[in-house]
């Protein structure tokens, strides 16, 4: 969506909701007979995002009862414009809550309504996603949710853990994903602080990924890929280019690592979905004011490694890493 439009909407969201007092807990009364309708917009079918949706549904069903909630789960096949269509349809149906899975879904939802509560998940950085300057951890208005951001400084440290002599590291990301750039900026600074030379390798979409990556890996000792939806959808392409060159890849999340990486410090997307579902229950069942709900995080990311690729690249796995189970 257009950042300018979103920047205009966000202050209006706060003022509109503050004026209407939509979530005043003092006047809230839970109707045990009500059947809630929840719209779920997911940018694309992907193992990590799928787990987040599953966790969300499980938590809500357990909290409300399966017979008291109806989910309308729709996927946008990777198209932000389709997210907008989906979210607008949810607004027309007057759903009780929208769960937006991934940044494009959140942006579309934010642009579709100022009244219906919106919970994001699998969103790396809400300040970046919603163009909020000096983001303090609470969006305000009708938006909150959970973040899939893992400690980026610790991900950067993994490069030296697995490739001790690394001096030149590439940073692969899709230029269309603002959250990817945020991660790259942070990791790059951490690597440079360790006297590692970095090289940004950005591509526009899946059509130019192969050409861009192939033309930029010469001389690299390792590659870092952030949590990036386009990269996650194209791990087979990345693997087919990097593995023959014996180029180890540190990844931002588990499913990406399972497809092409050697190691990751990854959050649990199912648990993240559960946390998002618990936030939904606080809103729907307890009348909690979403405008005051801070963004939630998985505070226990796990160090994981891809056994097959580590063995093929003859890489020694440090203690404390758990093998990724490839489904």
Question: For each predicted feature, which ranges?
Answer:
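Hydrophobic alpha-helical segments within soluble ligand-binding/sensing domains
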Residues: 30-31, 126-168, 267-288
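C-terminal motif of bacterial Sec signal peptides marking the signal peptidase cleavage site
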Residues: 16-19
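Beta-alpha junction/loop-to-helix N-cap segments that form part of ligand/metal-binding clefts
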Residues: 72-134, 228-243, 247-252
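Pocket-lining segment of extracytoplasmic ligand-binding domains
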Residues: 178-247, 253
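Flexible loop/turn connectors
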Residues: 256-308
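An alpha-beta-alpha
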Residues: 38-40, 56, 144-191, 289, ...
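Bacterial signal peptide processing site
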Residues: 21-23
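Extracytoplasmic "Venus flytrap"
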Residues: 32-57, 63, 72-82, 228-230, ...
